[in-house]
Amino acid sequence: MELKQTPLHSIHKEMGAKMVPFGGWDMPVQYTGIIQEHLATRANAGIFDVSHMGEIFVTGDANDVLDFLESVTCNTISTMKEGQVQYNAVVNEVGGLVDDITVYKFNDTKYMICSNASNFEAVTQHLLKYVKGNVSIANDSKNWHQIALQGPKADAIFTKYLGKDLSSILYYHFEEMNWRGETIIVSRTGYTGEDGFEIYTSNALGVTLWKELLEIGKDFGLVPVGLGARDTLRLEAKYPLYGHELNAEWTPVESGINFIVKEKSKPYLGYDRIIADKKNGPKSKVVGVRLLEPGVLRENFPIFAADGKEIGKTTSGTHSPSRKESLGLAILQTEFAKNQTEVFVEIRGQKKLAKVETGAFVQGSVRNNR
């Protein structure tokens, strides 16, 4: 199958990026190196091409749109204000995830769902399957370009670029702005644990934005960042990734995103199983693990208790550039998922000591804008 290309594809190649297939797209995995890009984002700022993500617009009668969205997601849409972004999940009939998403509320009759690159077609089809009432669903991804500007200096860079104070955009909020003759969406969100923005524009303006931000960001230490460092950054922040910590079988509670699960007056898809997990606790759940012996955690390594009983497996793993040790996420039987519990990870036939760590591995600058 031929890989899709973002509007920045030729620019990535000109910049010397190493390209890899990802979710059906040909994407940059690194430019100068994963560690350098990771540390630059933590210390200064990084710019990411995320225009492979999907944008789905849900519009129609206010009551019908709200009822529909509430019926297919596990977080509470009704509490959202205009200009707010919400982390949520589209759920299936058995309580698993079709995808984790961000929901943007423009007004009572218009919402946007941002979904993962590999899942936005599945999300669109799932929404169309259950749509009812006066509601329209439009997968408008081909007309939108998305750039993420992340890091403690992201605000200063984008403020200088726009010539506009951005302090009014709070964490998990967005504003529509007129820029270069078109409406763009500026959202204070991200996938790194750092302060920053996700910026939605037309494809043409997205290319211009990329070039100009890199130029104006030179004095701030801004660097282009590929998918490799995007993954290590999200893992340090303990953000889940679909196909690793999230899938069609595990409930959001099992996947470690219990905080987005809400009880509602009308049940949503998979409601009984999801709420039972929230109330009674799941049999297994995703937590962080830190390796205490030499080695590097990767996905699907079996994990054992001290008595030799197999209790779970890793779902993601890496060598953390910030902490200079191997960190990972894992699904463990709940009794072993408590903070500082000692477990053993099997790496190449050897069982190595590790400890469970709850909470983020690295606390980035995102906390400064809560």
Swiss-Prot record:
EC numbers, comma separated: 2.1.2.10
Mind listing the UniProt keywords for this protein, alphabetically?
Aminotransferase, Transferase
**SUPFAM superfamilies documented for this protein:** Aminomethyltransferase beta-barrel domain, Folate-binding domain
What GO cellular component term, any one, is given? glycine cleavage complex
Question: Superkingdom of this entry's organism?
Answer: Bacteria
Q: What class of enzyme is it?
A: transferase
Q: How does it assemble?
A: The glycine cleavage system is composed of four proteins: P, T, L and H.
Protein name (record): Aminomethyltransferase
Instruction: Look up and give the organism this protein is from.
Output: Leptospira biflexa serovar Patoc (strain Patoc 1 / ATCC 23582 / Paris)
Q: Please name the gene that encodes this protein.
A: gcvT
